[in-house]
A protein has these predicted regions:
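Glycine-rich flavin
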Residues: 2-4, 8-9, 26-33, 38-125
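Beta1/beta-strand and adjacent pyrophosphate-binding region of the FAD-binding site
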Residues: 4-20
């Protein structure tokens, strides 16, 4: 984590690695700009880490269990039991894989990653 002023120059400074931030940073890197991306939490933002993706992963697992238990018309006889701890671990693996992918894409496109918080200050910011 960086505490204090960052005095090194950069062409583009992006604050926040959510879906807008990391895409902007990657594109700037593809354009051969010197780009720095500052993120205080995990890459991907709220949707990837705490919202859309984890929710959909759990819904998918729950639907699979439900469908397996209601498929007797197809000749499938099952009484699935959900191990919530294992399902949560699977969901965490899905999220970790995607956040890791965002980080790798950033690095592959020359984005300098900084863990911390940032703000613009001064008359010209």
């Amino acid at each position: 984590m960086v505490v204090g002023d960052v005095t090194t120059g950069t062409d583009v400074l992006v604050i926040g690695a959510g879906p807008g931030g990391y895409v902007a940073a990657i594109r700037a890197g593809q354009l051969d700009l010197d780009v720095t991306l500052v993120e205080r939490d995990a890459y991907g933002g709220a949707c990837l880490n705490r919202g859309c993706i984890p929710s959909k992963a759990l819904i998918t697992g729950s639907k699979l269990a439900h469908d397996a238990g209601n498929a007797e018309d197809l000749g499938i006889h099952a009484n699935p039991a959900v191990d919530l701890s294992q399902m949560m671990n699977w969901k965490d693996g899905v999220v970790d894989g995607l956040t890791g992918g965002v980080e790798k894409l950033c690095k592959a496109n020359g984005v300098n990653l900084v863990e911390g918080t940032a703000e613009f200050s001064g008359e010209d910011s």
